[in-house]
Amino acid sequence: MREALRVGDATKPSVLEVRTTDTCFRAVVAASAPVRAWFEDDAHATRGAELSGTSGLVPPRGPACARKGETLRLVVEPASPSIIARAVVWQAP
């Protein structure tokens, strides 16, 4: 996997466009207080399992994959607006 995106403010959804080939994503999220984090597609369907906590991998058990032409979003939902959250997203290939 290679780094695809660094997100300084992960409390806003981060868009990941799959342009050339089927792609799988994983992210590490770190927050100042517990958050919920997941990948979702254009239909708002969750791709992979959700993270609940202050830090960890999203999805926790393996990558979220998308087909060429699809768009995924990393969504980090804070419990309160004052939470600081950051993320790094990796992709393969």
Model-derived regions, located:
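A general sequence property marking short-to-moderate contiguous segments
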Residues: 1-4
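Acidic, Ser/Thr/Pro-rich low-complexity intrinsically disordered segments
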Residues: 6-93
